[in-house]
């Protein structure tokens, strides 16, 4: 590695620290959040791990002294809602934390890695807040935070090509299908994001009029009528990148309806988390995750997520990227 390449990597590392520190400061202030510590692993039988699309298997290990099988978290969606209850948060107060996960079955490409790092967050809300207007108000706060950090990073490192609009554009998954009926869901996201630069697609989970789903969602935490994805257009890669997924959490009625629809009723009696929902023991919350490496990749105008995070990649893959001038950490 030559000196120029080393200097470039060192500058990137410093910029990553700037982005993370700045984002956390503004994020906590704008959403009234307190930072908390979070688990790296949970008991496999607790029901607290996120099973994502129920096809990706969590990485697990046997803890000899505990005589238990533990699972590396795939996200903290369920744990956070329980934490708000246990930690005694008040209405409209929330938490955020660093979530580090291993998703062994994930794809590997310029925006996907088997290592996932994100800010997981959750806020205590009222039942009356379970509506699209409230969801959009939270999205606007998160987007304004991203934009503040973008402007700060532009002044420090001048990536130039990153341009975010003053406001984010909202569209439902059905409206998006109506707009581009002959395109795949991912292609619709790309076309709309390329035009508007920053978008939020809401109401993801149920089939659209075509019979297809925008993208598969677990039925256990988000209300599929009150959730969505925050997506930006990354000009360097000519690509739509999801920076955040979030939603108002399920009530008992939402949970029953969605698990019945997804045919995932078989383990409810033995699942601690499911039982808490069914017995109305969990507070009403809104929450989500914001990809740390993806945000850094986007704001620093990088071609590959491996330029801003350390993971494991196939040797041939790394060699091919190196030929293109892309050095993975």
Curated annotation (Swiss-Prot):
GO terms for cellular component: cytosol. It is found in: Cytoplasm. Keywords: Amino-acid biosynthesis, Asparagine biosynthesis, ATP-binding, Cytoplasm, Ligase, Nucleotide-binding. This is Aspartate--ammonia ligase. PROSITE patterns: AA_TRNA_LIGASE_II (PS50862). Pathway: Amino-acid biosynthesis; L-asparagine biosynthesis; L-asparagine from L-aspartate (ammonia route): step 1/1. The gene is asnA. InterPro entries: aa-tRNA-synth_II, aa-tRNA-synth_II/BPL/LPL, AsnA. Signal peptide: none annotated. Belongs to the class-II aminoacyl-tRNA synthetase family. AsnA subfamily. Its EC number is 6.3.1.1. SUPFAM superfamilies: Class II aaRS and biotin synthetases. It is an enzyme of class 6 (ligase). The lineage of its organism: Bacteria, Bacillati, Mycoplasmatota, Mycoplasmoidales, Mycoplasmoidaceae. It comes from Ureaplasma parvum serovar 3 (strain ATCC 700970). One of its GO terms (biological process) is L-asparagine biosynthetic process. HAMAP family: AsnA (MF_00555). It catalyses: L-aspartate + NH4(+) + ATP = L-asparagine + AMP + diphosphate + H(+). One of its GO terms (molecular function) is ATP binding. Its main location: cytoplasm.
């Amino acid at each position: 590695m030559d000196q120029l390449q080393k200097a470039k990597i060192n500058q990137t590392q410093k910029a990553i620290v700037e982005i993370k520190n700045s984002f956390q400061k503004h994020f906590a202030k704008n959403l009234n959040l307190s930072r908390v510590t979070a688990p790296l692993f949970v008991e496999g039988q607790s029901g607290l791990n996120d099973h994502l699309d129920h096809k990706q298997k969590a990485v697990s290990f046997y803890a000899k002294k505990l005589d238990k099988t533990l699972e590396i978290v795939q996200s903290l969606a369920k744990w956070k809602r329980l934490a708000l209850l246990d930690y005694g948060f008040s209405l409209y107060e929330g938490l955020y934390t660093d979530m580090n996960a291993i998703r062994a079955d994930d794809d590997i490409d310029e925006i996907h890695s088997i290592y996932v790092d994100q800010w997981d967050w959750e806020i205590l809300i009222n039942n009356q807040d379970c509506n699209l207007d409230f969801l959009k108000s939270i999205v606007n706060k998160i987007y304004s935070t991203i934009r503040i950090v973008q402007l700060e990073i532009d002044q420090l490192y001048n990536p130039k090509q990153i341009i975010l609009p003053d406001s984010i554009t909202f569209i439902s998954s059905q409206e998006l299908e109506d707009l581009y009926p002959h395109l795949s869901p991912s292609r619709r996201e790309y076309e709309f994001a390329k035009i508007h630069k920053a978008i939020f697609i809401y109401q993801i989970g149920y089939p659209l009029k075509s019979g297809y789903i925008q993208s598969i969602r677990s039925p256990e935490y988000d209300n599929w009528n009150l959730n969505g994805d925050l997506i930006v257009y990354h000009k360097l890669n000519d690509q739509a990148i999801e920076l955040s997924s979030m939603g108002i959490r399920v009530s008992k009625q939402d949970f029953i309806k969605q698990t019945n629809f997804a045919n995932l009723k078989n383990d409810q009696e033995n699942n601690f988390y499911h039982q808490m929902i069914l017995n109305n023991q969990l507070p009403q919350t809104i929450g989500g995750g914001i990809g740390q490496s993806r945000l850094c990749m986007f704001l620093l105008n990088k071609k590959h997520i491996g330029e801003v995070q350390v993971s494991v990649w196939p040797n041939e893959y790394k060699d091919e990227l190196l030929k293109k001038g892309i050095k993975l950490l």
